[in-house]
Amino acid sequence: MIHEYDIVVVGAGPIGGYLSGKLSQSNHRVLLIEEHKEIGRPFQCAGLVNPGAMAKVGLYDTALTRIWGARMYSPSGIKIEIGNPDITRTWSVCRKIFDERVVMNSVANGTDIWLSSQPKSAVINDDYVEMVIDSDGTERIVRTKLLCGADGAHSWVRRNFKMGRPKEMMIGLQIEVTGYDTEDGKLDLFTGENVAPGFFSWAIPSGETTRIGIWSKPNLLGEKS
């Protein structure tokens, strides 16, 4: 059996979920596929949603903390505080619930979704792209007029069509903790070779917990990772 769609979106994160929903609203037949068995897992980012993006999806009830400012620490320990309590800079959200809601809205608009599914091949023909998708252990053939890759930094779509790779790769490490001394509405940013060689580290209040992480180049972290 061949499954035919106007558009296939690979990756059911917030971008893939939002894109597929908007396309379905425009009366396109859309298939959204996700390699994991559930939406929002694994959690792979700091969980910040800027005001413009939040306004588009309207999922304010998924927010854990409203961020309006920051405490920034220089390599020498000097602290600079910025922000205005009256101006929201970003929202710290529960990514699992946020992602699920974005995808649920897409499905409500008519999107089909296959979980535990990942593409095995995609060949461009004159009028369509023919894909073989492993869907929970069963191979399915899909034909689509448009294939969209929303599958992240290690995109299968990018690799399959040899669309190049980023000139520079960085790595992020993060842990969620309790007991960190935060200031209401402010996140912390740290710079310096001792704490974040090559870039910066952060501490983001997220309701009753704090997400502490670092962004750097793998070769610079060494034993620090």
Locate predicted features.
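Beta1/beta-strand and adjacent pyrophosphate-binding region of the FAD-binding site
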Residues: 1-13
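Glycine-rich FAD pyrophosphate-binding loop
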Residues: 8, 21-43
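Short beta-strand/turn micro-motifs composed of small residues
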Residues: 11, 34, 74, 216
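Predominantly flavin-linked oxidoreductase catalytic cores and closely associated redox partners
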Residues: 12, 26, 105-225
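N-terminal Rossmann-fold NAD(P) dinucleotide-binding loop
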Residues: 16-17
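Short, hinge-like loop/turn segments at secondary-structure boundaries
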Residues: 47-51, 166
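A conserved beta-strand/loop capping segment in the N-terminal third of enzymes
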Residues: 50-103
